[in-house]
Regions:
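Acidic, turn-prone loop/beta-hairpin segments
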Residues: 95, 184, 188, 194-200, ...
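Residue patterns forming the tRNA-binding/recognition surfaces of aminoacyl-tRNA synthetases
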Residues: 2-13, 17-20, 26, 30-34, ...
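Residues immediately within or flanking Cys/His clusters that coordinate Zn2+
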Residues: 184, 395, 464-466, 509, ...
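Short cysteine-rich clusters marking metal-coordination/redox-active sites
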Residues: 187, 398, 469, 512-515, ...
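Alpha-helical recognition segments enriched in aromatics with Gly/Pro capping
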Residues: 314, 342-354, 458-460, 479-633
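Protease-associated
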Residues: 240, 244, 251-324, 333, ...
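Cys/His-coordinated zinc-binding microdomains
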Residues: 191, 457, 473, 516, ...
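N-terminal catalytic cores of NTP/NDP-binding nucleotidyl/phosphoryl-transfer enzymes
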Residues: 42-103, 164, 231-238, 246, ...
Length: 932
């Protein structure tokens, strides 16, 4: 008789082939239809909240791998907290204003943007930004990211702009915002000021020069004739702006007389290096004094008709140069402050476009970089050049146009960070920084930073809501003007600032608080984009949900310590007088190629998330984000994704095995802990360990720990051991018998727990599992994310002594399998069920191991037809071997005796007339064979 139909084979609709690229869009459509995000919030409404405030990406390009990493990490956190009972609203946002969009519009339409009406230009920018919001949103949703996609926040929205005006107004009211003329980062190509966070450094070739300034007025302390102060600079073009020479007041300075008769003033610590640069081998020291000795002396500018003052400054170091520092207050922050102390008037001989002005004399009209060579040639010709050297240095560039930038003094609006710096530093104490070094980094950046330049000379930005009195020229910004402009922006949007004249924008009856004047002009600058994004926690989160402020978490790349993290902290302390707007701050690294190199279009090593989703599916992209320790840089390549696909299949196939063997299983079939077989309890105990690992991993945001633990659980504990042993019970035992129901109970608990715990990482696959499995009362079958993660099943757990016994069995099984493989290789057996294994202890360790496992069902656990424990020496005619885990264990593989059961293939000496072993005979007897 053919007993094939008496075997209970796996049956499930859960397919072996994932087909994620084809299957996921339909699942997304269903999730959107039932509004899974809303259901997730409703489930946990009224419970403790976990608020992850979204750092807004800039809306000027399609999503890249950095976006994919960032958004999936956020989704892991939102989903995992939702599945642990937290209320988790997640509102995605976008940063819209700024130079990159302006540049894109100008380039795309070949516009002369200065000739184009500002409202028209801004409308084009807004349409451009909205287009990329839509495209990026589509990409994020395709990744499976849950959020309030119907109501994202946008920094260009009317309500947001209205609230941001209030943020500015409050900081102005407190005296934190002022207008001043001081050096700032300036992009000549884009003709705008830049923030520190908008600067990138690149290595550029450079000519450094040593220049002689002839001493004029020495206050009677030195011989003036033929004596020169030697300065050193890498920015030749700034020499027209030189007004002073700074010395360190405590350092030793010397005047040396060279063989050529000239005398030079330099720092003693840098004397040898300076003389070597100038090719001077013979010289003698004729004077030695501290730097303060030379204070208030003057030196003749090498090519302009004015003198430079010798001043003292503590920041002058002996690391490089001559110790006599070229000081141009229009081009450097330290220079500016030093000259202010000495009441030296400011000059800025470079204009907005980076061209030398009339103040530069004969160099007027030259671009700053073009003037380098001309000035150098003139210095050589006049004899003022002491030396020059070629080298490479790290130089700041604009983050958007990639052009070199300059430092120049211009009238700008500033936020006086100095006024609340101590409070900002103190606020860092109440934040959980992940990694912990984030606190030190943030504190150092705040302590070291200058005042924040918040104005930009651009059109696509939030207008700075300040008026100027036409009578006295002073700025006017009052609570009344702020309230009025906020209301106007809330109703019409900020374009109204450019559509109306100043007198149409001021509140009725406004008079200048300084002079009583009644006519006004409006500010033309716009706010720094970092002020926009730094206000999101107020203009979006706090405005719409004041009870959710401060956010539980900010999560962005490590570059945001000087960007969004910092600007948000400063607006919180400055405008609100509160601490940090986040309780936890988590950072991730960069995405790099498979070799660890930065991905660039020019290198051709970029990877497009859309391509990966098309080829592998969103779940594999998410698995990539979860598998690496994202606190370091995360590598990305097609090869890595192929390997991840293999790991994914191990999880999927494990789930499919469980589901296939749960056909016909319902919650009422669950076996009580006291009735469950010990092997199944071992599996559930291992599952409990995984559950605890999952909770700890989610608590610590260490998703790679979880993915590796699940992979090991599927491969080591399940596939290589437990599931291998289980097949006989599942296929051949009585359908409703305890042994099979015990195994099914364990499989159910395993697949149910894995679907829940891995759902934040693989939402598509885990929901597919969820739809294919049986459920208990209380389960929300609509989507796995609407359910809680399971706690460890402690009632089913084995104690430590029992688990140690299973450790011994697993080690012994490995030893036996090694000898079985040898018997197979020697053609003594085919399958393991053709073997009869005899075990003999030759030392104390082996004897103890056999004593430990002697009462276990070794035949079933070793997957052979019979096992005996013996003291007899092995028969030399059989295949024998020693253990590895237990070297004193002698293992003999004999040919199994008896008849091979045609149903389960076990060999039995007690087969019935049909050749069935006793177990199979009993099971078959229960069946109605006529209906099979």
């Amino acid at each position: 008789m053919d007993y094939k139909n008496t075997i209970i084979t796996p049956k499930t609709d859960f397919p072996m082939r994932a087909g994620l690229p084809q299957r996921e869009p339909g699942m997304l459509e269903h999730w959107n239809k039932i509004d899974v995000y809303r259901l997730m919030l409703e489930k946990n409404e009224g419970k403790p909240a976990f608020i992850l405030h979204d750092g807004p990406p800039f809306s000027n390009g399609d999503i890249h791998m950095g976006h994919a990493l960032n958004k999936t990490l956020k989704d892991f956190i939102v989903r995992s907290h939702a599945m642990r009972g937290y209320y988790t609203p997640y509102v995605p946002g976008w940063d819209n204003h700024g130079m990159p969009i302006e540049s894109a519009i100008i380039k795309k339409n070949k516009l002369n943007h200065k000739a184009m009406p500002i409202p028209e230009f801004r409308n084009a920018c807004q349409a451009f930004a909205q287009d990329f919001i839509d495209r990026q949103m589509s990409g994020f949703r395709r990744l499976g990211v849950l959020g309030d996609w119907q109501h994202p926040y946008k920094t260009m929205d009317k309500a947001f702009e209205a609230e941001e005006v209030k943020v500015f107004g409050e900081m102005y009211r407190k005296g934190y915002i002022y207008k001043g003329l001081k050096p700032v980062y300036w992009c000549p190509k884009d003709e705008t000021a830049l923030a520190e966070a908008e600067i990138e450094y690149q290595d550029d070739p450079c000519t450094s020069i040593y220049v002689k300034f002839a001493l004029k007025d020495t206050k009677g302390k030195l011989e003036a004739g033929n004596t020169y102060v030697i300065i050193w600079t890498t920015t030749t073009w700034t020499l027209p702006g030189n007004l002073a020479i700074a010395l360190n007041p405590q350092e030793s300075y010397v005047v040396v007389k060279a063989a050529n008769g000239e005398r030079y003033l330099v720092a003693e610590a840098l004397l040898e290096k300076t003389m070597k640069a100038g090719g001077i081998e013979e010289y003698e020291i004729v004077e030695r004094h501290e730097g303060r000795y030379f204070e208030y002396m003057t030196a003749q500018h090498p090519f302009l008709p004015r003198e430079s003052l010798l001043v003292c400054a503590d920041y002058v170091t002996m690391d490089s140069g001559t110790g006599c520092v070229h000081t141009a207050p229009g081009f450097g922050a330290d220079d500016y402050q030093t000259c202010r102390r000495y009441n030296i008037d400011l000059i800025v001989p470079v204009d907005d476009r980076g061209r030398q002005t009339e103040a530069a004399g004969k160099y007027a009209g030259l671009r700053y970089d073009e003037s380098n060579a001309v000035i150098l040639a003139d210095l050589k010709e006049s004899g003022a050049l002491f030396a020059s050297e070629e080298f490479t240095h790290s130089y700041p560039h604009c983050w958007r146009c990639k052009s070199p930038i300059i430092f120049r003094a211009t009238p700008q609006w500033f936020c006086s960070v100095e006024s609340f710096k101590d409070e900002a530093v103190a606020a860092c104490d109440n934040v959980k920084w992940l990694p912990a070094w984030g606190k030190d980094r943030m504190v150092a950046m705040i302590r070291d930073r200058a005042d924040w330049c918040i104005s930009r000379q651009r059109r696509w930005g939030l207008p700075i809501p300040v008026f100027y009195c036409k009578d006295c020229g002073k700025p006017v910004c009052t609570p009344e003007t702020i309230a009025h402009i906020s209301a106007l922006f809330g109703e019409h949007g900020s374009n109204v600032w450019f559509e109306r004249e100043a007198m149409e924008l001021v509140p009725e009856g406004l008079s200048c608080p300084h002079c009583g004047g009644r006519t006004f002009e409006k500010e033309t600058d716009t706010l720094d984009g970092w002020f926009d994004s730094g206000s999101t926690h107020i203009a979006s989160l706090r405005r719409e949900h004041p009870d959710q402020w401060p956010a539980t978490m900010y999560l962005e790349g490590a570059d945001q310590y000087r960007g969004w993290f910092q600007s948000s902290l400063l607006t919180s302390v400055g405008a609100l007088g509160q601490g940090a707007p986040f309780r936890e701050c988590l950072t991730h690294g960069w995405t790099v190629d498979g070799e660890g190199k930065a991905m660039h279009k020019s290198l051709g090593n970029g990877v497009d998330p859309a391509d990966l989703i098309r080829d592998f599916g969103a779940d594999i992209v998410r698995l990539w984000a979860a598998s690496a320790d994202y606190r370091a840089d995360v590598r990305c390549s097609k090869e890595i994704f192929k390997q991840l696909s293999q790991n994914y299949l191990k999880f999927r196939n494990t789930a499919r095995y469980c589901l296939g063997n749960l056909d016909g299983f319902d919650a009422e079939h669950l076996v009580a802990p006291e009735d469950m077989l010990e092997l199944d309890r071992w599996a559930v105990t291992k599952l409990n360990e995984l559950i605890r690992t999952a909770f700890e991993a989610y608590d610590n945001y260490e998703f790679h720990v979880l993915t590796h633990a699940i992979n090991d659980f599927c491969v080591v504990e399940l596939s290589s051991f437990y599931l291998d042993i289980l097949k006989d019970r599942l296929y051949c035992e009585s359908r409703n018998g305890l042994k099979r129901r015990s195994a099914q109970t364990a499989l159910y608990l395993i697949v149910d727990a894995m679907a829940r715990m891995f759902a934040p990482i693989l939402p598509f696959t885990c929901d597919e599992i969820w739809q294919a499995m049986p459920h208990r009362a209380g389960d929300d079958v609509r989507n796995v994310v609407l359910n809680e993660m399971v706690q460890p099943y402690e009632a089913y757990a084995l104690d430590a002594e029992a688990m140690a016994r299973w450790d011994t069995l697993i080690a012994l099984r490995g030893d036996v399998n090694g000898v079985l493989e040898q018997a197979r290789a020697d053609k003594r057996i085919g399958k393991a069920l053709e073997a009869h294994v005899a075990l003999c202890a030759r030392d104390e360790a082996a004897a103890k191991a056999l004593e430990t496992v002697k009462d276990m069902d070794l035949t079933a656990l070793l997957l052979v037809s019979d096992v005996i424990l013996t003291d007899d020496d092995p028969d030399a005619a059989n295949v024998t071997g020693s253990g590895t885990a237990f070297p004193g264990l002698r293992i003999e593989v004999r040919n199994a005796e008896g008849v091979k059961c045609p149903r389960c293939w076990m060999h039995s000496t007690k087969a019935n007339a049909d050749g069935l072993c006793p177990r199979c005979a009993a099971v078959v007897a229960e069946l109605d064979l006529g209906n099979l």
